């Protein structure tokens, strides 16, 4: 009750979190390419996006470029893993580097983990909040949309340090009041699904990924096999 705020999808949870934690002129670090809402959400909150490029072919992070994006005005960093649109899954080593920078500069991490169960090739999802020293400076966003194939339901949540929960809920209340109560009840049931559900979900998506790669690559398309 002190950490979880339900909202109208992770999209609204992201907006509520930014409005609750950012002041005009603050800077927000985000990796590009990125899901289309992150930059505009920061701008609507009065903040300034600072972009760090993920490099092809496997969308690696340049640690020097990442470190150079942090300064005294940096208030937050957004991490989306598995990443939309690249399919990159951030490694524990990459997340540890991000965590070290967050601690050094006293920066809040906002993580969008909506694809956490859709991972391929033996990759593992590592929540940034599980990295040492990050539980108290991470807001984790998620939703029912992708894991349970109900994107139209618009049920999501933010898991925040207790000290931030009140501010996020206040903004959420004035944005949308709340997600549909019957759909929240259904979501609570879905969250108790057995582990076999998630394994079958990921396996099904991986089969479709492999099918598309097998069609595209022989025809001359350069493809990065998404990890998630």
Language model regions located:
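A short helix-loop-beta submotif of the ANL/AMP-binding
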Residues: 44-50
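Short beta-strand
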Residues: 222-227
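Generic structural signal for small/hydrophobic residues in well-ordered secondary structure
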Residues: 4, 28-29, 42, 77, ...
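Helix C-cap/helix->beta junction micro-motif
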Residues: 45, 104-105, 219
């Amino acid at each position: 009750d002190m950490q979880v705020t339900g909202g109208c999808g992770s999209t609204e949870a992201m907006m509520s979190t930014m409005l609750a934690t950012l002041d005009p002129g603050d800077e927000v670090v985000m990796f590009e390419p990125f899901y289309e809402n992150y930059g505009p959400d920061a701008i609507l909150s009065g903040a300034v996006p600072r972009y760090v490029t993920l490099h092809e072919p496997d969308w690696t992070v340049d640690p020097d470029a990442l470190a150079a994006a942090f300064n005294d005005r940096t208030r937050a960093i957004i991490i989306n893993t598995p990443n939309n649109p690249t399919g990159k899954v951030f490694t524990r080593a990459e997340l540890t580097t991000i965590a070290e920078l967050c601690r050094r500069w006293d920066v809040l991490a906002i993580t969008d983990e909506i694809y956490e169960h859709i991972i391929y090739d033996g990759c593992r999802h590592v929540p940034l909040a599980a990295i040492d020293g990050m539980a108290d400076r991470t807001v984790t966003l998620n939703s029912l949309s992708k894991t349970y194939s109900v994107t139209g339901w618009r049920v999501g949540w933010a898991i925040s340090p207790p000290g931030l929960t009140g501010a996020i809920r206040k903004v959420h209340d004035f944005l949308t009041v709340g997600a549909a109560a019957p759909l929240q009840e259904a979501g609570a049931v879905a969250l108790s699904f057995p582990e076999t559900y998630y394994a079958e979900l990921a396996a099904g998506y991986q089969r479709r990924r492999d099918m598309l790669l097998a069609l595209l690559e022989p025809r001359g398309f350069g493809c990065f096999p998404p990890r998630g």
